[in-house]
Amino acid sequence: MRADARKNYDLLIEVARDVFVEQGAEASLRDIARRAGVGMGTLYRHFPNRDSLLEAVLRSRFAALTARAESLLLAADPAAALLEWLAESVAFTHQHRGIIAPLMSAIDDPESALHSACVALRAAGTSLLTRAQQAGLARPDLSGEELFDLIAALAWLREQPS
């Protein structure tokens, strides 16, 4: 990638991250391009659709949550590690309003731009859950899919009007 193209790509990611946090996942792509100081053509050259932009924005955060889960696998208390990761995951969903519907549909859609990021996030939580279950500190009948659904449900509740 040319240096100027890379600069625009990185700038679009940075601006989109802020706009998605401020306005939610359905924020205007035109607003993102305007705030980044680029044209719509530049945005679409890098990101052909909203899902690809959202996936790029979320990729770094998912990687951080995955890395956090991996580091928590070494924690002395598997239940506390699982709860800490769960709290961080829920906090992330609260920062990014409107991502739950796309995430829940992407987890089952291998064609979605968000699919691989969702699968990695669920696998990270499943590893922590399995460790807590093996220590007898979590219900043995709870699955990684149900844990992912719990995160989604908590985020969905947060998005509902009071």
Predicted feature locations:
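Amphipathic alpha-helical interaction segments
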Residues: 11, 80-88, 120, 146-150
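Hydrophobic alpha-helical connector segments
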Residues: 56, 67-95, 109-113
